[in-house]
C-alpha cells in the first residue's frame, strides 16, 4: 500500500505518524511518503505561538470539539515524560480578557483549573472588565515538527521537497491513497471557495520574566485581532492580527506597530524586551475543517483521497484528533479493499 501525504506542517506530519503507528504492523508493505514544497522552519506551524486553545465560540461541526479534546488528552499524557522537552511541550497558565461578560467557553472542562477572574486580578488589567484563568499547554511548532520528523524517519517514512501541481500527478506516480494536508494552499489542488488565508503577523521577544499567557478579546474586531502575549520555551510571542483574504507574506510595519503598542500597553515591561524575530503566516480559514474521503478517477483507476485541511488558527490545538480520524477513514479504505488482516492497534 503506497500512501502519499501532501503537506509537512503539523497536520501532515502528525497524520503520517498516526497512520504509520496504527497500520505498519497489520499492513505489509506500508510505504508512506511526505511531499511538500515547504518543510520546517518554513511552514505555517513554525510561526504559531503554540498555545492549546480553541476559538471561544462553539464549532459548527461538533466533531471538532471531540478532536480538540483528543488532542489535549494526547498532549497531556506526554507531560512528565522524557518526550515532553523534545516535543516542545510544557504546561502554561494565563488569562483571557474581555471588555464585557461573556459565556464560558465550551472547552472550559478540557483545560485545567478553569475559573473566572476575581476583581483583584482584573485590577491588573484596567482596560478589561471580565476574564478567565486556566492552565493549558504550550506546544512549540518548530520543535514539535522536528520531533515528528525524527519519529517518521525512524519508521522509514521518506520526505520529498517538491511542489505538487495536481492529485493526478501523485496518483499516476503510484499512490494508492493520497492524504491532502495542504492547509491554506489546498485550493491549488482542488478549488474550495470556502477556504481563505487568515494572515497573522507576530513578533518574538526575549522576555523570560513573563510566565503567563494573556489573550485579549475584542468581540467587534473578531478573533485574534487584539493583543495577545504567549510565552514559549525560548521566546515570547506577541500578536494581534487576523486578516482574512490577505495573501501578503511580507512583514508590515503598520501591523508591527499595532502589535507592539497594544502588547506594551497590556504588559509595560515588554518595552525593555529585545526583539529576536518577526514572522508572517497564513491560517487556513474555513467555516469548518474539511476531513473526508473522496474518490477521484484518473484514467482507468480510482484513487482514494482523504482531505484534512482548513484548521484555521488552531491546527496545533486539534491536530491529533484529526490525525486519529484520518486513520479511521484510512482503515475503512483498507477494509473495503480486503487488505486488513487484523484490527489496527490503538483505534
Swiss-Prot record:
Residues 1-16 are annotated as: Required for protein stability. Its EC number is 1.4.3.3. Inhibited by benzoate, sodium benzoate, thiolactomycin, and hydrogen peroxide. Inhibited by 6-chloro-1,2-benzisoxazol-3(2H)-one (CBIO) and benzo[d]isoxazol-3-ol (BIO). Malonate and meso-tartrate has no effect on activity. It comes from the Eukaryota. Its cofactor is FAD. D-serine binds at residues 224, 228, 283, 313. D-dopa binds at residues 53, 283, 313. Expressed in the liver and in the kidney, including in epithelial cells. Not expressed in the lung. Homodimer. Interacts with BSN (via coiled region); the interaction is direct and inhibits DAO enzyme activity. This is D-amino-acid oxidase. The lineage of its organism: Eukaryota, Metazoa, Chordata, Craniata, Vertebrata. The gene is DAO.
